[in-house]
UniProtKB/Swiss-Prot annotation:
Family stated for the protein in its record: Belongs to the SdhE FAD assembly factor family.
Cellular component terms (Gene Ontology): cytoplasm
Protein name: FAD assembly factor SdhE
A Pfam cross-reference name: Sdh5
Keywords, sorted A to Z: Chaperone, Cytoplasm
Length: 84
């Protein structure tokens, strides 16, 4: 189980100041992150260490991360919001 302190910290780190990222990351950390396994949680935390411009490109599907684990996390976040 994820502690409230960790979720609060991740919530604030997920607020990037770029609306396009905020609308993807904030709901993900609130609704999905608590149910992830530890490997995926670690990957999400690693994603938050990336530059906003890099993440913007990945989420807009203009580029891909060289790290396959980060790309998998980006896909997981996008799959959550894109119509099937």
């Amino acid at each position: 189980m994820v502690e409230d302190v960790e979720l609060n910290r991740l919530y604030w780190h997920s607020r990037r100041g770029m609306l396009e990222l905020d609308v993807l990351l904030v709901p993900f950390v609130r609704e999905v992150y608590p149910h992830l396994n530890e490997t995926d949680r670690e990957c999400y935390r690693k994603l938050l260490e990336c530059e906003d411009q890099d993440m913007f490109g990945w989420f807009m599907e203009r580029s891909e991360s060289e790290d396959p684990e980060l790309q998998r996390m980006v896909r997981m976040i996008l799959d959550r919001v894109q119509p099937k």
